[in-house]
Structures are given as C-alpha cells and as structure tokens.
Amino acid sequence: MCIRDSRLAGGIDPFSAGNALREIVPAIKALWRGDYTGEGEHWSFPKTTSSPKPQQTPNPPIWIAARDQNSHDFAVKEGCNVQVTPLWLGDEEVSSLMEKFDIACKNYSDIERPKIMVLRHTFVAETEEEILQGAKDISRFYCYFGAWFKNERPIEQGLIEKLTDEEMAGLEMYSPENMRKNSVIGSPEEVIARIKFCEDLGYDEYSYWIDSSMDFETKKKSLELFIEKVMPAFN
C-alpha cells in the first residue's frame, strides 16, 4: 500500500516502490552469494554479505506479489514464486491473474516455471445466517481497506475516522452481496468447490486470508471448519 511505502521510505510513490523492488531482489540474491556492493538508484551500501549463508541452492525461494503483467514478468524472469490476490473481485480476476502468470512463463520459457499462490478472503460456516454475517464482516473490512488506501480520512491515535453506515452502503463493489459472490465464503462444500476452481486453473498453493473485521472466536471456528472439513478434500 502507498501508506506503508511512504512510512518506510520517507515518502515514495507506488511507481518508485516497484522500481525499488526490482532493484533489491537481484541485490538480495547477490548478498546471499557474498561480497556484494550496492550501487543502485534506491539502494546503496558498501561491500557486504549475509552471514550465515543460506543452504538452499541457488538461493532460498523468494515470493513476489504481482498484479500487472510487468510484475509477473519480473518475478518469473528472476526465478521467483508469485503470489496474487483478486482482493474484493471474484473468479474472473483469479483467472485473469493466472493468464498473466502463464504469459510471463511463456515470455521467459528458458526459466524453470516457478510456483504461484492465490490469496483469497475465506470464511467457512455451517448455517446461512453465519455465512451472511461473514459476508457483512468482510464487506466492512474492504470498506475500511479502501478508506485506508485512499489516505484521505483523518487519523487519530493510529485509528482512521469511522465510516458511517451510509458511506459503507454507498460502496457497492464492497457490498455484502458482492463479497458473498466474490470471496470464498460458504459451507465446507461451497468452499471446496471454489478452491477446486483455483486448483484447476493451475494454482500451486492456496492462501487462506483470515484478516477481517470478525471477532477472534468467529475466525477460529471458521479456521477449524476449514481444517476439518475442507483440507481433507486436497492432497
């Protein structure tokens, strides 16, 4: 997020953040090999190395979050695994992200195909009432996610100014109905089918996005149902 980049780098726009990533990934690999001097636009440091050295050959796996085609291309070119998320969007976006990854693999066919992981908001419940409440909670999460990302509302003591019910109701793309449709929310059987869809597209790993506006016990129950009734459907 731009807020995080600004905080960590003392003010940096998303485009510059992408360039900084493209510079630091090769540098990290070189540091693992040892005696590397950083002389880049964003990173500069004298000859140094990592200690101890990693045991993996040629280096530990690196995961890069990607959305646009350039990010997929860069990750595959560098031999890095890719993590994608449709955010509040649905299966169409999940398919589109895999298409970008496949294009990147074709563009760099000389590189061994890396792994790809999809991160999706996931909620498992046993009753329709619980499922609908889960959709409402994830809707609320994204309303605040969008507000933080826009970086326009006042912040006091680390908390953003509360959104009104009217403001959240006006954010149709984050509506509970859309979250119920787009996010992986439902009974164990429904969730299995949604994850099978991702598996059939070619995703290697599925990441359960548990962060939401739900309370701890609700999250715990969902995760327990996922472990007990969803995971056995997969190897």
Placement of each model-derived feature along the sequence:
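A conserved active-site cap/scaffold subdomain adjacent to cofactor or substrate pockets
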Residues: 68-89
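Glycine-rich tight-turn/loop motif centered on a GG-T
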Residues: 8-15, 220
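Hydrophobic faces of well-ordered beta-strands that scaffold small-molecule active sites
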Residues: 62-65, 80-85, 114-121, 206-208
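N-terminal beta1-alpha1-beta2 module of alpha/beta enzyme domains
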Residues: 57-60, 225
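Glycine-rich, proline-tolerant flexible connector loops at the mouths of alpha/beta enzymes
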Residues: 86-91, 153, 207-222
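Alpha-helix-loop-beta-strand connector modules within alpha/beta enzyme cores
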Residues: 20-24, 223-235
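Conserved small/polar residues in nucleotide/adenosyl-binding loops
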Residues: 1-3
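An alpha-helical appendage that flanks or caps ligand/catalytic pockets
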Residues: 15-50, 92-203
